[in-house]
């Protein structure tokens, strides 16, 4: 795991490139636990409790102070673009391509190394004291139409299930939709089972993202079981072919 900075930390703070930033107020650099709790309380009442304020654009801090990932527990991730070795090759390539395209928030993506035995969402949530609603799962669904197989990567909050029989089936325009077998999912994605992620999926697949994942942070797979990726909803929405779908997660 990426070394801790030392001392108990109720939340994680994020670095971002200077060019993207608006200088934070001095008070934000010396947050007390009460100030952090107030910051977290801004999110309550929303569907996932993880969405950023809706007024204006989200900005990123110049130092380790202003951005908090609610519900991250004891994990302490680091900038993903500086640790591409912790990502599966297609994931590293896709994240790098986003940054090269000028998607500013791509540089805010974070990664953390974990024990592969803790990769499953419920196990990881329990082990690190995370909020289950922070995690978003990527589920592969397939169906056929006139002999053509159609595949969708569906991203939903871990507190919900993908509506395969209605929403996904309608989007794919197939008579029957079902989960893809593990062996085929691993082979076609180039990722490990338990680490499959929307970042870097093949361009021929549909990429359906529940609207609840398009705001706030998500903990998602890195393509490997030995690490996890943290991205904002802006990053997910900027992925090639991404479709934001209301009601995908139920």
PLM regions and their residue ranges:
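Short hydrophobic alpha-helical segments enriched in small aliphatic residues
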Residues: 14-16, 35, 41-44, 56
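Intrinsic-disorder-associated, low-complexity terminal segments enriched in Asp/Asn/His/Tyr and depleted
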Residues: 39-43, 49, 60
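Leucine-biased recognition of intrinsically disordered, low-complexity hydrophobic segments
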Residues: 21, 26-29, 46, 50
